[in-house]
Amino acid sequence: MTYQSYLCFINKSTIMKKLNLFLFINLSIFSFAQEISKERVVNIISTLASDEMKGRKFGTPENDKSAEYIASEFKKNNLGYCVGDSYLIPFEHKGQKGFNVCGIKKGKSEKSLAFSAHFDHIGTNNKAGDNIYNGADDDASGVSTVIGLADYFKDKKTDYSMVFMAFNAEEIGLIGSKALADNEKLNPVFNNISALFNFEMLATESQFGKNAVFMTGDEFSDFDELINANAVNGLKVHSDPYQGQQLFYRSDNVNFVKKKIIAHSISTVDMNKATHYHAVNDDINIVDAENLTNIINNFAKTIEKLNTKNFTPKYNDKVNFDF
């Protein structure tokens, strides 16, 4: 090799090293920028679970304000309307009017994945001192997951279309999700849902540890197996450890099960240890924000891998549609 050739080789090697370093740094920055920050998650929960929201009880101005806040977040993420010209879909229950919230992101396929959580809680009590049931875990944490997923996929091209829903009046009998599921104007949306992820109480560490959730009704479909097969960064969906409590039939997912849509609830709550369920200490201080943020980002990256070929969950013959 001549001296000139040697210099040329050295220069090319140096340039390639610098180029590779540049690409690595930029790809790392881009990847990091796609993630939902802990500050963002805390902000969403703090807004919904603030004292000003007075427990978000159905039929109150604060409940309406919560729905409007979620709708504004859907708008920021450029979601389309599920029906009509608003994210807010009204319904009535015993003479009181409320709103569910629904937005849609179009993908390459008409088939969709749906993500949901309920935003209402149980209001206040008449006792002295702290009398507000803030509902940070139940279920502002689930709403933060739905909004976080909308954030993550805002500028991404996905195979599946995506439906984002926030249900009202869960605490008084799953009323809001039933009203939405029974709304015939939404049949064109619901008829294309391949699977629904209903997020319910994710603010605390599960009995399985960090970065781990459990899924209700795992015995009825292969939903969890398919998620675990595609899971990233150690995310793990465990079987329901509380099957005797029939949680599958006691959360908003059930109103979509009735429509024979694959619909499961996902949670981290340790029901053997939790002392904040429907208690005034269910506030921002109960939230393990780092773990929740990690779960949201890992679900987002896992869902990003899903398409109409590698994720088509099905019910087995154990599920009961008539109840």
Residue positions per predicted region:
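His/Asp/Glu-rich mid-to-C-terminal helical/loop segments that flank catalytic regions of hydrolases
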Residues: G59, K273-F323
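N-terminal capping segment at the start of a domain
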Residues: I36-K65, N77, K273-A279
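Metal-dependent peptidase/peptidase-like ectodomains
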Residues: F167-S265
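A non-catalytic alpha/beta surface segment that caps or lines the substrate-entry region
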Residues: R56-K106
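Zn-dependent metallopeptidase/amidohydrolase metal-coordination segment
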Residues: Q245-L292
